[in-house]
């Protein structure tokens, strides 16, 4: 008898035409909720509409329908991203000096925005060099285009049109997969298939296609650009693709074709797949041959990873088996039950993804300056500062979002009866120990980090510098960080004998890469000032985590409110007659967590901005390196007064004195954003009753004049007021910082 593997069963994974397409719904705001569909009777309606429009859980309890809406919305999100990208590329094609910058990136500044002189604001068009008048941009697009091998504005036009085509496709896909062929719930829950496709397809083939583009297009074009060839003389991408001899002139191993690949002599390809380390001295960026090698390696890893999970063929890993086998001697049932959670609660899934993505985004921020990936990025200080700040803020918001969705999962999706003695249950049962220990850590870090600063300010004020904690008095050197730096700096000759240079110049040594007389990257020394600020970082991060984690762990119940789960994710208080129960909802913890996230990230970007200007960025002359602020960080950052005087006040002079110059828009934004920030306090420090009384008085006046509105005005609810408050607080604070940073660094960098 013959034994055959079982036939893979054919599953029907879509429903055809589940929801009719109708434009009439567009004319009925709030059609998704019975209470909202009636239309507005009070002004609260518009706030509830915004709060619930994307809260698909509140529209229906059918998980399949929720999943389809989320899936469809993702295509809409991608369409918006493609339209935005297309706009960036169009600006590069139509309003930029990209071709001029490409021919002289060390003297000409990037600009892709030209202000039209409608009411005399053409003063904003500064001279960026090469006879071009425009606003200096700090997005890094020019550098990424150069790294990708873009040599003309026509290519940017073509890509901009391609972006619009892709956006159209995404919008059609979003409609198609909700109205025409909507996936069944089983398709959304098929985690093994999803892992295989996302790992091998998205990450694996995505990296492979980028590696292919780098090898066949970017490397030859950048090699010629680095050698000083005029961009107009460089062959077009398709010529490199179609004519192997052109490539072989630059990378001789191309003449051998695929023979070395199939004969396993892969080292033959080492002319374009390198392992150099360090930075290209011409551009100040990573060697593009290193990054091509890196993406090829990543592609191989992820394509292999995308074949690990069991689908129709009965071989490979099963996620459920992995999770249920994951038990330790002290962890009860281990991860049993988590599979069900992660396949039925998209909030739980989203919380993990946001926490991971947020952490990765912050890691990206730190690599963008220490290992600058694109040509001429490292010497464009405005772009370096912008990219670091941007990725830090994004990471902070993602991490707070993780706390929000973890709490929503516990309130809406968690079923305690199915989770007995697994890790989640055990964490929830000893939450008091977790939170009280974390609270102790926060108190310790807060008093000690702040205490060191208060000591220094007091000694400085009393004229006793010899009794301060500083590099020139009582030293508190960050010895562990210095040990890590030295280990990495010594690696090339020691633990990594094949590496020509350390992974980053920041680790130490004597190397300095300068491009056009500007420092690209050099060793970053750490001292007492960094030790002090580091502990402020530790403090603010731990407090943010304390607030978010307390919100998550006590989202279903607490000693104060044992039935909290019944009150939902957001509620103002536990009903009338129970004093002292306001601001305890999971939503309120997210609200408070946002302020501490803002604190934490602000200290990080201030530290980065000042440290780089003091110890890294600057010009190289015959006498040595002249840093922008002359190395004043080590002495001044050891007191709070030093931060206020030598960082905030000293460096705000550019934005405050920007009127009458091309930077004046930053002066206006600095003022306006301060106003938005202050406006937020009106919402955060006021009571609802105060506004309701005022509104009723104003309505009385309208009634007197017979102009009373049909929709009855209402004061914002407590939670709506706090949401408006925190939104303006963050918007005002971030925009103020943005104007302060850019006016400063564009003026001096």
UniProtKB/Swiss-Prot annotation:
Keywords: 4Fe-4S, Chlorophyll, Chloroplast, Chromophore, Electron transport, Iron, Iron-sulfur, Magnesium, Membrane, Metal-binding, Oxidoreductase, Photosynthesis, Photosystem I, Plastid, Thylakoid, Transmembrane, Transmembrane helix, Transport. This is Photosystem I P700 chlorophyll a apoprotein A1. It is an enzyme of class 1 (oxidoreductase). P700 is a chlorophyll a/chlorophyll a' dimer, A0 is one or more chlorophyll a, A1 is one or both phylloquinones and FX is a shared 4Fe-4S iron-sulfur center. Belongs to the PsaA/PsaB family. It catalyses: reduced [plastocyanin] + hnu + oxidized [2Fe-2S]-[ferredoxin] = oxidized [plastocyanin] + reduced [2Fe-2S]-[ferredoxin]. It comes from Zygnema circumcarinatum. Chlorophyll a' binds at residue 674. Phylloquinone binds at residue 691. [4Fe-4S] cluster binds at residues 573, 582. PsaA and PsaB bind P700, the primary electron donor of photosystem I (PSI), as well as the electron acceptors A0, A1 and FX. PSI is a plastocyanin-ferredoxin oxidoreductase, converting photonic excitation into a charge separation, which transfers an electron from the donor P700 chlorophyll pair to the spectroscopically characterized acceptors A0, A1, FX, FA and FB in turn. Oxidized P700 is reduced on the lumenal side of the thylakoid membrane by plastocyanin. One of its GO terms (molecular function) is oxidoreductase activity.
């Amino acid at each position: 008898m013959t034994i055959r593997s079982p036939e893979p069963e054919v599953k029907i994974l879509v429903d055809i035409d589940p929801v009719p397409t109708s434009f009439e719904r567009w004319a009925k705001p709030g059609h998704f909720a019975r209470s909202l569909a009636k239309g507005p009777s009070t002004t609260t309606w518009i706030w509830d509409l915004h709060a619930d429009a994307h809260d698909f859980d509140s529209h229906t309890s059918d998980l399949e329908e929720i999943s389809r809406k989320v899936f469809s919305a993702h295509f809409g999100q991608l369409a918006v991203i493609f339209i935005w990208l297309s706009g960036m590329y169009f600006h590069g094609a139509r309003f930029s000096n990209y071709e001029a910058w490409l021919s002289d990136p060390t003297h000409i500044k990037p600009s892709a925005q030209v202000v039209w002189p409608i009411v005399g604001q053409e003063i904003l068009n500064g001279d960026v060099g090469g006879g071009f008048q425009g606003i200096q941009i700090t997005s890094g697009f020019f550098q990424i285009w150069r790294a990708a091998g873009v040599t003309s504005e026509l290519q940017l036009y073509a890509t901009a049109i391609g972006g619009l085509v892709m956006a159209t496709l995404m919008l059609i896909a979003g409609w198609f997969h909700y109205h025409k062929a909507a996936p069944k719930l089983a398709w959304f829950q098929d985690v093994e298939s999803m892992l295989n496709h996302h790992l091998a397809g998205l990450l694996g083939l995505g990296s492979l296609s980028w590696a292919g583009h780098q090898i066949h297009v970017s490397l030859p074009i950048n090699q010629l650009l680095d050698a000083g060839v005029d961009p107009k003389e460089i062959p077009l991408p398709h010529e490199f693709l179609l004519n192997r001899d052109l490539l072989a002139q630059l990378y001789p191993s191309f003449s051998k074709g695929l023979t070395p690949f199939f004969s396993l002599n892969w080292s033959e390809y080492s002319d374009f797949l390198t392992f150099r380390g360090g930075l290209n001295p011409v551009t100040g960026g990573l060697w593009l041959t290193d990054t091509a090698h890196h993406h090829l390696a990543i592609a191989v890893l992820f394509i292999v990873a995308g074949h690990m999970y069991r689908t129709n063929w009965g071989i490979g890993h099963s996620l459920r088996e992995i999770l249920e086998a994951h038990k330790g001697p002290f962890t009860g049932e281990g991860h049993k039950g988590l599979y069900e959670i992660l396949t039925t609660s998209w909030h739980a899934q989203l919380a993990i993804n946001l926490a991971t993505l947020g952490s990765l985004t912050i890691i990206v921020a730190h690599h963008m300056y220490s290992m600058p990936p694109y040509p001429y990025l490292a010497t464009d200080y405005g772009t370096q500062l912008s990219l670091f700040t941007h990725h830090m803020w994004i990471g902070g918001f993602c991490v707070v979002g993780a706390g929000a969705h973890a709490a929503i999962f516990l309130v809406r999706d968690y079923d305690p009866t199915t989770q007995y003695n697994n890790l989640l249950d055990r964490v929830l049962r000893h939450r008091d120990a977790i939170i009280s220990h974390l609270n102790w850590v926060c108190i310790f870090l807060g008093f000690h980090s702040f205490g060191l600063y208060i000591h220094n300010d007091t000694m400085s004020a009393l004229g006793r510098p010899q009794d301060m904690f500083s590099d020139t008095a009582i030293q508190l050197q960050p010895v562990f960080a210095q040990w890590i730096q030295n280990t990495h700096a010594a690696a090339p000759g020691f633990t990594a004998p094949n590496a020509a240079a350390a992974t980053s110049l920041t680790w130490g040594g004597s190397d300095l890469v300068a491009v056009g007389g500007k420092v690209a990257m050099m060793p970053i020394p750490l001292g007492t000032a960094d030790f002090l600020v580091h502990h402020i970082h530790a403090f603010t991060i731990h407090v943010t985590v304390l607030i978010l984690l307390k919100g998550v762990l006590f989202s279903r119940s607490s000693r104060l409110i044992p039935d909290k789960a019944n009150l939902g994710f957001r509620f103002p208080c536990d009903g009338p007659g129970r004093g002292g129960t306001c601001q305890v909802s999971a939503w309120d913890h997210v609200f408070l967590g946002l302020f501490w996230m803002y604190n934490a990230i602000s200290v990080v970007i201030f530290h980065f901005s000042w440290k780089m200007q003091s110890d890294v960025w600057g010009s190289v002359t015959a006498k040595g390196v002249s840093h922008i602020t002359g190395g004043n960080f080590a002495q001044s950052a050891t007191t709070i007064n030093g931060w206020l005087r030598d960082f905030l006040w000293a460096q705000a002079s550019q934005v405050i004195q920007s009127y009458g110059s091309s930077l004046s828009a930053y002066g206006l934004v600095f003022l306006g954003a301060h106003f938005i920030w202050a406006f937020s306090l009106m919402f955060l420090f006021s009571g609802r009753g105060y506004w309701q009384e005022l509104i009723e008085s104003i309505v009385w006046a309208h009634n007197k004049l017979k102009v009373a509105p049909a929709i009855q005005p209402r004061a914002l609810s407590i939670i709506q007021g706090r949401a408006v408050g925190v939104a303006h607080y963050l918007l005002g604070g971030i925009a103020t910082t943005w104007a302060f940073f850019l006016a400063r660094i564009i003026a001096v960098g």
